[in-house]
Protein backbone atom coordinates (compact mmCIF):
# COMPACT_ATOMS: atom_id res chain seq x y z
CA UNK A 1 0.00 0.00 0.00
CA UNK A 2 1.33 3.42 -0.98
CA UNK A 3 -0.01 6.45 0.88
CA UNK A 4 0.68 9.80 -0.78
CA UNK A 5 0.67 12.48 1.90
CA UNK A 6 1.72 12.42 5.56
CA UNK A 7 -0.89 14.79 6.95
CA UNK A 8 -3.49 13.71 9.55
CA UNK A 9 -5.50 11.52 7.14
CA UNK A 10 -2.35 9.96 5.67
CA UNK A 11 -0.82 9.17 9.05
CA UNK A 12 -4.05 7.59 10.26
CA UNK A 13 -4.31 5.61 7.01
CA UNK A 14 -0.76 4.35 7.62
CA UNK A 15 -1.74 3.12 11.08
CA UNK A 16 -4.94 1.51 9.85
CA UNK A 17 -3.28 -0.19 6.89
CA UNK A 18 -0.74 -1.65 9.31
CA UNK A 19 -3.59 -2.84 11.50
CA UNK A 20 -4.91 -4.62 8.42
CA UNK A 21 -1.56 -6.41 8.03
CA UNK A 22 -0.50 -4.48 4.95
CA UNK A 23 3.02 -3.35 4.09
CA UNK A 24 2.93 0.43 3.88
CA UNK A 25 5.01 3.15 2.26
CA UNK A 26 4.19 6.80 3.01
CA UNK A 27 5.39 9.57 0.68
CA UNK A 28 5.39 13.30 1.38
CA UNK A 29 7.26 16.14 -0.29
CA UNK A 30 7.53 17.90 3.10
CA UNK A 31 10.43 16.88 5.32
CA UNK A 32 8.32 16.65 8.50
CA UNK A 33 5.16 14.58 9.10
CA UNK A 34 1.86 16.27 9.86
CA UNK A 35 1.13 18.17 6.64
CA UNK A 36 -0.40 21.63 7.05
CA UNK A 37 -0.93 20.88 10.73
CA UNK A 38 2.80 20.83 11.43
CA UNK A 39 3.97 23.20 8.69
CA UNK A 40 1.43 26.01 9.09
CA UNK A 41 -0.34 25.66 12.44
CA UNK A 42 2.07 24.05 14.93
CA UNK A 43 1.04 26.33 17.82
CA UNK A 44 -2.65 26.62 16.96
CA UNK A 45 -5.04 24.97 19.42
CA UNK A 46 -7.40 22.45 17.81
CA UNK A 47 -10.70 21.84 19.58
CA UNK A 48 -12.72 19.65 17.20
CA UNK A 49 -10.99 16.25 17.35
CA UNK A 50 -13.23 13.74 19.13
CA UNK A 51 -12.12 12.79 22.63
CA UNK A 52 -9.45 15.53 22.78
CA UNK A 53 -10.81 18.76 24.34
CA UNK A 54 -7.85 20.83 23.12
CA UNK A 55 -4.46 20.08 21.57
CA UNK A 56 -1.75 22.04 19.76
CA UNK A 57 -1.28 21.29 16.08
CA UNK A 58 2.30 20.08 16.58
CA UNK A 59 1.21 17.82 19.44
CA UNK A 60 -1.55 16.23 17.37
CA UNK A 61 0.88 15.74 14.48
CA UNK A 62 3.38 14.08 16.85
CA UNK A 63 0.72 11.77 18.31
CA UNK A 64 -0.53 10.80 14.84
CA UNK A 65 3.03 10.05 13.73
CA UNK A 66 3.63 7.90 16.81
CA UNK A 67 0.41 5.98 16.11
CA UNK A 68 1.29 5.62 12.42
CA UNK A 69 4.64 4.04 13.31
CA UNK A 70 2.97 1.25 15.33
CA UNK A 71 3.37 -1.20 12.44
CA UNK A 72 6.67 0.23 11.13
CA UNK A 73 5.68 1.67 7.75
CA UNK A 74 8.38 2.98 5.44
CA UNK A 75 8.21 6.76 5.87
CA UNK A 76 9.72 8.64 2.90
CA UNK A 77 9.65 12.31 3.85
CA UNK A 78 11.07 14.84 1.43
CA UNK A 79 10.03 12.64 -1.51
CA UNK A 80 7.13 13.77 -3.71
CA UNK A 81 5.04 11.44 -5.87
CA UNK A 82 5.75 11.88 -9.57
CA UNK A 83 4.81 9.52 -12.40
CA UNK A 84 2.33 6.64 -12.25
CA UNK A 85 2.57 3.46 -14.33
CA UNK A 86 -0.08 0.74 -14.24
CA UNK A 87 1.08 -2.87 -14.57
CA UNK A 88 -0.79 -5.76 -16.21
CA UNK A 89 -1.74 -7.27 -12.83
CA UNK A 90 -3.49 -4.04 -11.76
CA UNK A 91 -0.70 -2.87 -9.46
CA UNK A 92 1.36 0.30 -9.93
CA UNK A 93 4.86 1.62 -10.24
CA UNK A 94 5.26 5.14 -8.89
CA UNK A 95 8.35 7.26 -9.36
CA UNK A 96 9.28 9.96 -6.87
CA UNK A 97 10.67 13.43 -7.43
CA UNK A 98 13.91 12.14 -5.90
CA UNK A 99 14.30 9.23 -8.32
CA UNK A 100 12.92 6.35 -6.25
CA UNK A 101 10.67 3.65 -7.74
CA UNK A 102 7.86 2.18 -5.62
CA UNK A 103 5.70 -0.85 -6.40
CA UNK A 104 2.21 -0.66 -4.88
CA UNK A 105 -0.82 -2.93 -5.09
CA UNK A 106 -3.07 -0.01 -4.12
CA UNK A 107 -2.68 3.72 -3.49
CA UNK A 108 -4.42 6.11 -1.12
CA UNK A 109 -3.97 9.79 -1.92
CA UNK A 110 -4.13 11.92 1.23
CA UNK A 111 -2.37 14.98 -0.15
CA UNK A 112 -4.46 17.66 1.58
CA UNK A 113 -4.60 20.77 -0.59
CA UNK A 114 -1.86 19.35 -2.78
CA UNK A 115 1.55 20.88 -3.20
CA UNK A 116 1.36 24.28 -1.51
CA UNK A 117 3.87 27.05 -1.94
CA UNK A 118 3.74 30.40 -0.16
CA UNK A 119 2.95 33.58 -2.02
CA UNK A 120 6.21 35.48 -2.05
CA UNK A 121 6.71 38.92 -0.54
CA UNK A 122 7.02 41.26 -3.56
CA UNK A 123 10.20 42.87 -2.18
CA UNK A 124 13.23 41.57 -0.29
CA UNK A 125 13.17 38.03 -1.66
CA UNK A 126 16.97 38.00 -1.60
CA UNK A 127 16.72 37.81 2.21
CA UNK A 128 14.77 34.54 2.23
CA UNK A 129 16.39 32.37 4.89
CA UNK A 130 18.25 35.42 6.21
CA UNK A 131 15.49 37.16 8.09
CA UNK A 132 12.60 36.55 5.70
CA UNK A 133 10.53 33.42 6.25
CA UNK A 134 7.13 32.00 5.37
CA UNK A 135 6.76 29.33 8.08
CA UNK A 136 7.28 29.32 11.84
CA UNK A 137 7.49 25.67 12.88
CA UNK A 138 9.30 26.57 16.12
CA UNK A 139 8.46 29.96 17.66
CA UNK A 140 11.36 29.68 20.10
CA UNK A 141 13.70 30.34 17.18
CA UNK A 142 12.38 33.91 17.19
CA UNK A 143 12.52 34.46 20.95
CA UNK A 144 13.67 37.94 21.90
CA UNK A 145 13.53 39.27 18.34
CA UNK A 146 11.70 42.20 16.75
CA UNK A 147 9.18 40.59 14.41
CA UNK A 148 7.20 41.97 11.49
CA UNK A 149 4.28 39.80 10.39
CA UNK A 150 2.79 40.58 6.98
CA UNK A 151 -0.74 39.48 6.06
CA UNK A 152 -4.38 39.65 7.07
CA UNK A 153 -5.60 36.06 7.11
CA UNK A 154 -5.77 33.41 9.81
CA UNK A 155 -2.11 32.42 9.47
CA UNK A 156 -0.89 36.01 9.86
CA UNK A 157 -3.02 36.70 12.93
CA UNK A 158 -2.17 33.32 14.47
CA UNK A 159 1.54 33.90 13.93
CA UNK A 160 1.35 37.37 15.49
CA UNK A 161 -0.44 36.06 18.58
CA UNK A 162 1.87 33.07 18.86
CA UNK A 163 5.04 35.16 18.56
CA UNK A 164 3.81 37.82 20.98
CA UNK A 165 4.56 35.33 23.77
CA UNK A 166 8.26 35.00 22.93
CA UNK A 167 9.34 37.99 20.80
CA UNK A 168 10.73 41.32 21.98
CA UNK A 169 8.05 43.01 19.87
CA UNK A 170 5.57 42.08 17.14
CA UNK A 171 4.16 44.37 14.47
CA UNK A 172 1.46 43.17 12.08
CA UNK A 173 0.81 45.00 8.82
CA UNK A 174 -2.01 44.36 6.37
CA UNK A 175 -2.73 46.15 3.11
CA UNK A 176 -6.43 46.49 3.88
CA UNK A 177 -8.32 47.97 6.83
CA UNK A 178 -10.25 44.75 7.48
CA UNK A 179 -8.77 41.36 8.32
CA UNK A 180 -9.84 38.10 6.67
CA UNK A 181 -9.02 36.12 9.80
CA UNK A 182 -11.61 34.65 12.14
CA UNK A 183 -13.42 37.36 14.08
CA UNK A 184 -12.52 35.92 17.50
CA UNK A 185 -8.83 35.84 16.57
CA UNK A 186 -8.95 39.45 15.38
CA UNK A 187 -10.55 40.51 18.67
CA UNK A 188 -7.79 38.71 20.55
CA UNK A 189 -5.23 40.45 18.35
CA UNK A 190 -6.64 43.90 19.06
CA UNK A 191 -6.52 43.18 22.79
CA UNK A 192 -2.87 42.06 22.61
CA UNK A 193 0.40 44.01 22.65
CA UNK A 194 0.88 43.46 18.91
CA UNK A 195 1.23 46.74 17.01
CA UNK A 196 -1.24 46.80 14.10
CA UNK A 197 -0.62 48.91 10.99
CA UNK A 198 -3.34 49.07 8.32
CA UNK A 199 -3.54 49.64 5.39
CA UNK A 200 0.23 49.21 5.03
CA UNK A 201 2.51 47.26 2.71
CA UNK A 202 6.22 46.47 2.79
CA UNK A 203 7.85 48.76 0.23
CA UNK A 204 11.55 48.07 0.90
CA UNK A 205 13.75 45.69 2.88
CA UNK A 206 17.19 46.62 4.21
CA UNK A 207 20.05 44.64 5.69
CA UNK A 208 23.51 43.21 5.25
CA UNK A 209 23.89 39.51 5.99
CA UNK A 210 20.40 39.55 7.50
CA UNK A 211 17.33 41.77 7.54
CA UNK A 212 17.74 44.84 9.75
CA UNK A 213 14.90 47.18 8.72
CA UNK A 214 11.93 47.64 6.42
CA UNK A 215 9.99 50.53 4.95
CA UNK A 216 6.22 50.21 5.16
CA UNK A 217 3.93 52.46 3.14
CA UNK A 218 0.39 53.53 3.99
CA UNK A 219 -1.76 52.54 1.01
CA UNK A 220 -4.06 55.56 1.42
CA UNK A 221 -1.76 58.43 2.42
CA UNK A 222 1.50 57.08 0.93
CA UNK A 223 3.22 57.87 4.25
CA UNK A 224 6.41 55.81 4.66
CA UNK A 225 7.62 54.55 8.04
CA UNK A 226 10.87 52.72 8.67
CA UNK A 227 10.80 49.85 11.17
CA UNK A 228 13.82 48.17 12.74
CA UNK A 229 13.16 44.43 12.57
CA UNK A 230 15.10 41.20 13.00
CA UNK A 231 12.70 38.90 11.18
CA UNK A 232 9.90 39.18 8.63
CA UNK A 233 7.19 36.52 8.68
CA UNK A 234 5.27 36.77 5.40
CA UNK A 235 1.86 35.09 5.70
CA UNK A 236 0.31 36.06 2.39
CA UNK A 237 -1.45 32.78 1.67
CA UNK A 238 -0.52 29.84 -0.49
CA UNK A 239 -0.79 28.68 -4.05
CA UNK A 240 -1.94 25.06 -4.08
CA UNK A 241 -1.83 22.65 -7.00
CA UNK A 242 -2.07 18.91 -7.49
CA UNK A 243 1.23 18.79 -9.33
CA UNK A 244 2.00 15.40 -10.91
CA UNK A 245 -1.13 13.87 -9.33
CA UNK A 246 -3.20 15.77 -11.89
CA UNK A 247 -1.71 13.53 -14.59
CA UNK A 248 -2.65 10.23 -12.93
CA UNK A 249 -5.97 9.93 -14.78
CA UNK A 250 -8.29 10.43 -11.81
CA UNK A 251 -11.50 12.42 -12.22
CA UNK A 252 -10.95 15.87 -10.76
CA UNK A 253 -13.24 18.66 -9.63
CA UNK A 254 -11.72 22.06 -8.84
CA UNK A 255 -8.32 20.63 -7.85
CA UNK A 256 -9.92 17.89 -5.76
CA UNK A 257 -10.17 14.17 -6.46
CA UNK A 258 -13.68 12.82 -7.00
CA UNK A 259 -14.45 9.69 -4.96
CA UNK A 260 -17.44 7.42 -4.36
CA UNK A 261 -18.76 6.13 -1.03
CA UNK A 262 -15.85 3.69 -0.75
CA UNK A 263 -13.34 6.54 -1.26
CA UNK A 264 -12.44 4.99 -4.63
CA UNK A 265 -11.35 7.31 -7.42
CA UNK A 266 -12.09 6.75 -11.10
CA UNK A 267 -8.85 4.74 -11.36
CA UNK A 268 -9.20 1.18 -9.98
CA UNK A 269 -7.21 0.60 -6.77
CA UNK A 270 -6.53 4.29 -6.23
CA UNK A 271 -8.41 5.85 -3.33
CA UNK A 272 -8.42 9.32 -1.78
CA UNK A 273 -9.16 10.61 1.71
CA UNK A 274 -8.94 13.83 3.67
CA UNK A 275 -9.21 17.35 2.28
CA UNK A 276 -8.23 16.31 -1.25
CA UNK A 277 -11.21 13.93 -1.61
CA UNK A 278 -14.46 15.35 -2.96
CA UNK A 279 -18.04 14.05 -2.91
CA UNK A 280 -21.52 15.55 -2.35
CA UNK A 281 -21.89 16.85 1.20
CA UNK A 282 -18.15 16.80 1.89
CA UNK A 283 -17.06 18.55 5.11
CA UNK A 284 -13.36 19.33 5.52
CA UNK A 285 -12.55 18.36 9.09
CA UNK A 286 -9.66 16.37 10.54
CA UNK A 287 -12.13 13.99 12.17
CA UNK A 288 -13.86 13.40 8.83
CA UNK A 289 -10.50 12.61 7.25
CA UNK A 290 -9.88 9.90 9.84
CA UNK A 291 -13.12 8.14 8.90
CA UNK A 292 -12.40 8.48 5.19
CA UNK A 293 -8.93 7.01 5.70
CA UNK A 294 -10.36 3.93 7.43
CA UNK A 295 -12.98 3.48 4.69
CA UNK A 296 -10.31 3.79 2.00
CA UNK A 297 -7.95 1.30 3.65
CA UNK A 298 -10.64 -1.31 4.27
CA UNK A 299 -11.91 -1.13 0.70
CA UNK A 300 -8.38 -1.16 -0.71
CA UNK A 301 -7.61 -4.28 1.33
CA UNK A 302 -10.53 -6.10 -0.29
CA UNK A 303 -9.60 -4.81 -3.76
CA UNK A 304 -6.11 -6.26 -3.33
CA UNK A 305 -7.33 -9.54 -1.81
CA UNK A 306 -11.06 -10.29 -2.31
CA UNK A 307 -10.86 -13.06 0.30
CA UNK A 308 -10.39 -10.45 3.02
CA UNK A 309 -13.31 -9.08 5.00
CA UNK A 310 -14.26 -5.46 4.54
CA UNK A 311 -14.56 -5.00 8.32
CA UNK A 312 -11.53 -6.41 10.13
CA UNK A 313 -12.86 -6.18 13.67
CA UNK A 314 -12.07 -3.73 16.44
CA UNK A 315 -8.57 -2.73 17.50
CA UNK A 316 -9.56 -3.35 21.14
CA UNK A 317 -10.04 -7.06 20.43
CA UNK A 318 -6.57 -8.65 20.95
CA UNK A 319 -7.17 -11.61 18.64
CA UNK A 320 -8.05 -9.19 15.84
CA UNK A 321 -4.58 -7.65 15.82
CA UNK A 322 -2.41 -8.72 12.89
CA UNK A 323 0.61 -10.74 13.93
CA UNK A 324 2.24 -11.08 10.52
CA UNK A 325 2.75 -8.67 7.67
UniProtKB/Swiss-Prot annotation:
<keyword id="KW-0274">FAD</keyword>
<protein>
    <recommendedName>
        <fullName>Ferredoxin--NADP reductase</fullName>
        <ecNumber>1.18.1.2</ecNumber>
    </recommendedName>
</protein>
<feature type="binding site">
    <location>
        <position position="275"/>
    </location>
    <ligand>
        <name>FAD</name>
    </ligand>
</feature>
<feature type="binding site">
    <location>
        <position position="41"/>
    </location>
    <ligand>
        <name>FAD</name>
    </ligand>
</feature>
<dbReference type="GO" id="GO:0050661">
    <property type="term" value="F:NADP binding"/>
</dbReference>
<dbReference type="InterPro" id="IPR023753">
    <property type="entry name" value="FAD/NAD-binding_dom"/>
</dbReference>
<dbReference type="InterPro" id="IPR050097">
    <property type="entry name" value="Ferredoxin-NADP_redctase_2"/>
</dbReference>
<dbReference type="InterPro" id="IPR022890">
    <property type="entry name" value="Fd--NADP_Rdtase_type_2"/>
</dbReference>
<dbReference type="GO" id="GO:0050660">
    <property type="term" value="F:flavin adenine dinucleotide binding"/>
</dbReference>
<keyword id="KW-0521">NADP</keyword>
<feature type="binding site">
    <location>
        <position position="28"/>
    </location>
    <ligand>
        <name>FAD</name>
    </ligand>
</feature>
<comment type="similarity">
    <text>Belongs to the ferredoxin--NADP reductase type 2 family.</text>
</comment>
<feature type="binding site">
    <location>
        <position position="81"/>
    </location>
    <ligand>
        <name>FAD</name>
    </ligand>
</feature>
<feature type="binding site">
    <location>
        <position position="116"/>
    </location>
    <ligand>
        <name>FAD</name>
    </ligand>
</feature>
<dbReference type="Pfam" id="PF07992">
    <property type="entry name" value="Pyr_redox_2"/>
</dbReference>
<feature type="binding site">
    <location>
        <position position="316"/>
    </location>
    <ligand>
        <name>FAD</name>
    </ligand>
</feature>
<feature type="binding site">
    <location>
        <position position="36"/>
    </location>
    <ligand>
        <name>FAD</name>
    </ligand>
</feature>
<dbReference type="GO" id="GO:0004324">
    <property type="term" value="F:ferredoxin-NADP+ reductase activity"/>
</dbReference>
<comment type="subunit">
    <text>Homodimer.</text>
</comment>
<keyword id="KW-0285">Flavoprotein</keyword>
<keyword id="KW-0560">Oxidoreductase</keyword>
<dbReference type="InterPro" id="IPR036188">
    <property type="entry name" value="FAD/NAD-bd_sf"/>
</dbReference>
Amino acid sequence: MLIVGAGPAGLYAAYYAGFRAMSVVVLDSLTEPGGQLAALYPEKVIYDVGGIPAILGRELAADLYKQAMTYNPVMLLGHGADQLFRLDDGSFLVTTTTGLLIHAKAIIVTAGIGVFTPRRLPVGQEYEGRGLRYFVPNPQELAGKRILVVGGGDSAVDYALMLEKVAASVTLIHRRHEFRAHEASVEQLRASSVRILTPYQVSAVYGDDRVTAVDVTDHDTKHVERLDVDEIVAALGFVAELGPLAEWGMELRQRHIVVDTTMATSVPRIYAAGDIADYPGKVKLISVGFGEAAIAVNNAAVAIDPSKKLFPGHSSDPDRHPTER
